[in-house]
């Protein structure tokens, strides 16, 4: 039985999603426990900047509320985010609200419909964005590597990817290049210099950093410097014809930048207010020097736009209070996400519904697999017995005919006895109808 336990930006605020996603490692570590506790065998985890979802393949008859309780127990003890919400009282005591309360469970076709819609970008902050398709693909790949996937989950996620491609091809949602990164850069462009003149620092080297760099290049930005605390900046930048920020030079690079895009997703912020304020002070001194003013003369550097695309905040919210700095985070992006055309969304949902119906047919057919296996096993047993009765060496036509007749008689014996029993029980018509299904005229 297919189940999904999930929360998204539609059900919870980003702070709760951040806390849920903090438990990704724990959910993976306890995946065998989840499967064992639910008498099932399959777990796939999908955690992105605006959702936390667990897909389960469990035994038929499993109570969905039990599955919900198991997942809630796994994530309930996730620690608070290392960042307080903007304006929070530092002296406030006690834990925040339980983030697992936002989780909800879906069963069967509802779970499939949800995943197909997610993979198609219909449940994203920016409706129709294509980044989620890659995240869905990586989720099933991660489960495969962890050994927690099953045939049913493989088929589900394969259909989700086919549905995503069908929505992309059959609607205009993807044609506009809609994405979280795209909306963020459009917002940044309101305050930044024209992209061909802008100096950008990119923090991170993961898939989101790659998407961000591609989006910057598409807008004509050529001056991009890449920073990574993991040491992968050189390799990442070289492969994409960008420049790496030397180790220890991040704040110097920020002092020269017009835009900072961070998508590292670290547990602790990469940038805090003090560091950014220091970089701004250095930028002001350089502006004074370029203007030929005496040191201490007020010369304001160009504004700095900081874009934080990480769910686990890379940038302390207090950075937004630094003079001359505009901070754009996922909350800002969600508030400014453009609406998709109603016609495209309706067509996309039709495609999703068709995919759900197709998946249900496939799933129903696969439910007969155990019966088919038993049938084939019985035929193999009878065949092996008859082959064992044949003489060693060449077999005459007469011996082959006798063996085949015995095989046919043996195979027909049980159905024949069942036919007589059905007639005695007054169920002869049911048997005849079943026979027509097996051997149509």
From Swiss-Prot:
One of its GO terms (molecular function) is NADP binding. NADP(+) binds at residues 204-209. The keyword Transmembrane helix does not apply. Coiled coil: none annotated. Its EC number is 1.2.1.70. The record marks 114 as: Important for activity. This is Glutamyl-tRNA reductase. It is an enzyme of class 1 (oxidoreductase). Keywords: NADP, Oxidoreductase, Porphyrin biosynthesis. The keyword Oxidoreductase applies. The active site is at 49 (nucleophile).
